[in-house]
Amino acid sequence: LLDEIFNSLSLPERNAIQERILNEIKGRMLEDIVLLETKMANPGKQVFVLQFPIGEFDMVVFDPNDAACQIFEIKHSTEMAKYRYRHLIDQEKCAQTEHRYGSITKKTVLYRGENQMVEGIWYQNVEEYLKNLQVTPIAGV
């Protein structure tokens, strides 16, 4: 952030840019932590990011034995907003996912706010989600 153009900006502009960058980094780190912990807690399931030409599901937990999956958005935010779950209610994305991974049994936004249901979407506190995961220790580690 020692760039000439950056330094030519006013203090409020520089602060806003730094805050935006920091929030983006926190969001990506949170996604990585949730994916890793969920994978470790679900050795019989496939846990991955599912990308589409436009947008993605931040996490899919696919159970091949049940031919079913859960889809997630992971947000480093304390606020609920419809745009945060827009991919979870996208009919085309859901149809493609169900065709490939079976029935979608749950749609969840993991975020830093309170647990609640909104329009069929479960908003779950990410800290509670992580605390409730039962991680199986890896033998020999």
Language-model features: where?
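Conserved catalytic cores of phosphodiester-cleaving nucleases, focusing on short active-site segments
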Residues: 34, 38, 59-81, 88
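Short, high-confidence coil segments that cap the C-terminus of an alpha-helix
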Residues: 44, 101-104
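A structural signal for isolated positions on well-ordered beta-strands in alpha/beta enzyme cores
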Residues: 48, 70, 106-109
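Domain-level recognition of nuclease-like catalytic cores that cleave nucleotide substrates
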Residues: 109-141
